Structures are given as C-alpha cells and as structure tokens.
C-alpha cells in the first residue's frame, strides 16, 4: 500500500489566506489539499477552492473532503468534475457524503422527505455513468436524462470516494464507491469498517482497492483538544474517549497513523485542531511541522 498524507487547511481556508496557504503547500511538496463543505462559514467552497488551487499549482492534488451529493443534480456535479479533471489530470480527488455536518445546512441540500439515502445511491450511479460514458440515458426514481453528455470524460476514470461510518454508509462504499475516507474512528474501529466495506463489495462481485481506505485526523499541536472540536466529538461519538480520536501533537499523529496503517488504511488527511489567529501565517508552522514529522512516513 502506498501511504499518502494530505492536509486540510482548517480555519486557514478563508479567501483572505487561501492563496498563501496553497502556495506554501505546493512549495513544500505536500501531496494533497482537502476542502470541507461548510456553507455557513468563511471557508472557501470546495469546488471553487479546488479549481483555484489546481490552477495555481502543478503538483498539488485537491480533494473535496467531504462534499454533499444528495441535493445537487448529478449532471452538474459530473460537469464540474470532468472540467476539473480536464484542466488538472490526475489531481482531482472527489469525496462525497450523505448530508452536511451542520444540521442548519441540511435544508440547503433538499431531497424528498425520507429519501436522502435513496437519492444518494441514484446520484452516484448516474454520476459514474456521466463520467465514463459518451452518452447517457437514465430513468430513475429521482433523475431522468436522455442522451446526456458532459462533453469531456477523464482519460482515466475518476475514483469516487465516500465518507461515513454508519453500517449503511460503509455498505454503500462497498457497493458503489472506489474508496472511503472516514473520520473520528479509532484504529480498531477503522479496521472493522474496512472489513464491512470489503464484505459489501464482495456481495456484489466487486472490490475496493486495498489502498483506497483513508481517514481524516485532527491534530492538537499543544495536546489540548479545543472546546469546539470536543463538543463536535461528544455530539457524534458520545461514548468515545476524544483522546483516542484526536492526535496529541506530532508524536501522537505519527503513532496513530502507524496504527491506522496496521489496521489497513493508507490515505490520510491531517488538519490542525486549532490555529492561534486563524490566518495563513499561523498555518505555515503547521505545514513545516507536517513536512518534517509526517511526510517521511509516506512510501
């Protein structure tokens, strides 16, 4: 398995600081930049940020981590991804999820009541057809197209990754996706998730490539988990010890990544749990530490 470790900007991903942060990542030779979907925030929107970052760099990959698919029309999403892949071949890393992380944003991605999972499944099926077929005719419960084409298809089909950690989400990865990016799971839990995904894939006679399993890992550089992140963990994982889900400094990050690799994961998105003043200059020491402490773990 090829271990690769990318970076999410965290609170440094605002328009005022984004360009400087992207330039620093490129200069430092970081593998990839990941952009979360947080509409009610000052963070750059993922597809906009990906286009900007890819146009400004020549090596850096860019991923959406994680964008909401249900509530978006898959034809429009396919057009965006095909355009990005045409402009920056081999550097586009789409990851999709079922719903936004913030409850307040769910109304922005409207789907029929009680049908979000079904819409997600159908959206993924249509999205993949549009990215691989010259002309697509599709009649589903939620989407219908006839002779649809986005006009350009990636020379190599894009790998579509999904997030999520619920059993149904993991089985969806096995049935419909090319990879998985989890979060807030212990190494043991992540290893079990890999097993669930591969079992679901086998049931439909497919396989997720062994090196297509990853995790988003927050790093608390001073060892203290910020209150906002702590509240989020307690909301999502009330039974879990937060210290098992957040790396305490770079030593903790190296140790945890090693444990995740032993559990069968090889792709990681590391983000700062907090930054002093939420600006790009404050992010630069994080990048320097990341390059010094974590990049040598790649192979």
Question: Which residues does each predicted region cover?
Answer:
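Active-site-adjacent structural elements that line small-molecule/cofactor binding pockets in enzymes
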Residues: 1-299
């Amino acid at each position: 398995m090829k271990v690769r470790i990318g970076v999410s900007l965290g609170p440094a991903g605002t328009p005022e600081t984004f360009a400087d942060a992207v330039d620093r990542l490129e200069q430092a030779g970081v593998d990839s930049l990941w952009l979360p979907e947080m509409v009610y925030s000052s963070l750059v929107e993922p597809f906009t940020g990906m286009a900007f970052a890819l146009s400004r760099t020549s090596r850096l990959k860019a991923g959406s981590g994680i964008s909401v698919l249900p509530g978006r029309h898959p034809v429009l999403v396919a057009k965006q991804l095909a355009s990005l892949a045409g402009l920056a071949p081999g550097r586009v890393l789409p990851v999709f999820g079922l719903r936004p992380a913030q409850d307040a944003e769910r109304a922005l991605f409207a789907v029929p009541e009680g049908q979000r999972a079904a819409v997600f499944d159908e959206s993924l099926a249509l999205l993949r057809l549009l990215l691989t077929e010259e002309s697509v005719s599709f009649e589903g419960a939620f989407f219908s197209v006839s002779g649809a084409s986005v006009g350009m298809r990636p020379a190599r089909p894009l790998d579509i990754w999904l997030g999520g950690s619920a059993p149904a989400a993991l089985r969806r990865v096995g049935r419909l996706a090319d990879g998985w990016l989890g979060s807030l799971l212990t190494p043991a839990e992540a290893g079990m998730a890999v097993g669930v995904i591969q079992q679901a894939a086998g049931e439909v006679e497919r396989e997720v490539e062994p090196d297509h399993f990853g995790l988003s890992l927050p790093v608390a550089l001073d060892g203290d988990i910020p209150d906002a992140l702590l509240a989020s963990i307690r909301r999502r994982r009330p039974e879990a010890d937060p210290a098992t889900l957040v790396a305490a400094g770079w030593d903790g990050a190296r140790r945890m990544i090693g444990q995740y690799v032993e559990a069968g994961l090889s792709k990681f998105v590391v983000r700062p749990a907090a930054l002093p003043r939420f600006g790009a200059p404050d992010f630069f020491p994080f990048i320097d530490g990341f390059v010094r402490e974590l990049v040598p773990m790649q192979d």
